[in-house]
Amino acid sequence: MDRVSLTKREEELMSFLWDFGEPLTVRAMLDFCPKRTWSDNYLNVMIRSLEKKGAIEACDMMRYSRQYARAFRAVLGREEYYIYMAVNHGADAALLAQAAVAFVLREKPENMDQLLQELEKVLEEYRKNG
């Protein structure tokens, strides 16, 4: 999945799917998404577009109310998409590392221990696989 460019509305839908974390039918997306700004028909168009781009996939058949429908899940991860966007705008690994440090420094002190643990996990994974 090298180049996935999403529209603003597709990003909204992907963000909802990432946050929800479980496969959903189109009907469930319409019911559970509190801030939806799209119509039923437009959601179906977005689903087809995201499926074509490889960002989501149909993964199951689920019963919703009295009908069965395909359930979709995100294949494209949030981190993967944001990395693509950053690289697409000229960022490299060094710039992303600097941005990560700047981002961490903006956090509240009470969150610092958790952030440092996450960074240590990233470094450990890099040392293992890098």
Segments from the language model and where they lie:
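Amphipathic alpha-helical dimerization/coiled-coil segments
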Residues: 81-127
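A short, conserved structural fragment
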Residues: 51-63
